[in-house]
C-alpha cells in the first residue's frame, strides 16, 4: 500500500495518458454494456423460475411447454455465461431436447466440475439409446469425476460416503461388476438406520433394471427439437 501511495504525480499523469480514466466514454460504454448483459441474464433466469413456479401451482403443461420454447428462443445461441447455460440446460430437459441438453452440459462441464451432471450425461445417452460403448465410456468418466471429488473431501465428512458410492456405482454401470461388492460394503458400513435405508434404496435402483427403466421413462425425450 505504501509503495502505491509513493508513486509520483508525474507517474500517475503518464499512466492516465496511456489508459482510459474511469469516466472516459469508453469506460462508460463498457459499464453500460456489462449492466445490460447482466440484466438480460437475470431476466432469463427470472422468467425460467416464474414458469417453474406457475407450473407447480396453476399453469398447465402445454402452456409451460410453449413458454419454455419461447424463452429458449430469447437466449443467444452463442451464450457462454455459466448460469445461463445451466438455465438453458434445464429448459432443454423440460422440453425433452436431450441431445441439445447433452451439448450444453458439455459446455458447463468444461467450465466447472460436477460429478452429478457428468452422471446425468450417461442417463441422457441411455435414454437416447446411444452406442453401449459410448455409455460405458461416459460412466468411466463419471467414476473418475467422483474420484477427483473424493480426494478433496475429508473421510469423516458425510458426503465422502456419497462420493465414494457415486464412484463405485459408476464403475459398476460401466460394466465392472466387481464393484457390486464394494457397494454392499458401504451399506454394511452404516449403522444409522436412516442412512442404511437410503443406501439400500440406491442399491436397489442400480441393481433392479426395472427401477432404472422407470427412471428413464420419467425423462421426456424428443429427437425433433426445432
Predicted region positions:
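N-terminal leader/linker segments that initiate helical-solenoid repeat arrays
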Residues: 17-83
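Generic helix N-cap/helix-start motif at coil->alpha-helix transitions
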Residues: 39-52, 77-86, 112-122, 157-164, ...
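Alpha-helical adaptor scaffolds
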Residues: 87-96, 105-107, 115-160
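Classical Sec-dependent N-terminal signal peptides that target proteins to the secretory pathway
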Residues: 1-24
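Flexible helix-coil transition and linker loops at the boundaries of alpha-helical arrays
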Residues: 35-38, 70-81, 107-112, 144-158
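Alpha-helical repeat scaffolds
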Residues: 64-73, 99-109, 132-149, 177-190, ...
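Residue-level signature for tetratricopeptide repeat
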Residues: 53-57, 91, 124-125, 170
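TPR/TPR-like alpha-solenoid helical repeat scaffolds
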Residues: 119-129, 154-173, 195-218
Amino acid at each position: 500500500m505504501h509503495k502505491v501511495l509513493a508513486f509520483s504525480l508525474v507517474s500517475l499523469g503518464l499512466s492516465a495518458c496511456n489508459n482510459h480514466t474511469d469516466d472516459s466514454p469508453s469506460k462508460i460504454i463498457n459499464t453500460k454494456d456489462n449492466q445490460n448483459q447482466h440484466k438480460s441474464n437475470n431476466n432469463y433466469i427470472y422468467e425460467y423460475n416464474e414458469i417453474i413456479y406457475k407450473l407447480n401451482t396453476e399453469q398447465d403443461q402445454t402452456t409451460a411447454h410453449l413458454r419454455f420454447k419461447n424463452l429458449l428462443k430469447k437466449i443467444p445461441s452463442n451464450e457462454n455465461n455459466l448460469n445461463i447455460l445451466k438455465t438453458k440446460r434445464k429448459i432443454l430437459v423440460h422440453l425433452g431436447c436431450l441431445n441439445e441438453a447433452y451439448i450444453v452440459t458439455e459446455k458447463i462441464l468444461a467450465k466447472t466440475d460436477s460429478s452429478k451432471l457428468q452422471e446425468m450425461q450417461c442417463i441422457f445417452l441411455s435414454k437416447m439409446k446411444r452406442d453401449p460403448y459410448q455409455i460405458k465410456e461416459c460412466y468411466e468418466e463419471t467414476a473418475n469425476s467422483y474420484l477427483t471429488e473424493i480426494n478433496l473431501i475429508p473421510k469423516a465428512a458425510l458426503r465422502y460416503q456419497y462420493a465414494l458410492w457415486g464412484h463405485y456405482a459408476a464403475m459398476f454401470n460401466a460394466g465392472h461388476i466387481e464393484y457390486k461388492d464394494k457397494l454392499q460394503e458401504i451399506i454394511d458400513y452404516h449403522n444409522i438406520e436412516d442412512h442404511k435405508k437410503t443406501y439400500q434404496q440406491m442399491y436397489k435402483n442400480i441393481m433392479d433394471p426395472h427401477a432404472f427403466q422407470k427412471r428413464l421413462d420419467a425423462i421426456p425425450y424428443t429427437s425433433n427439437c426445432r
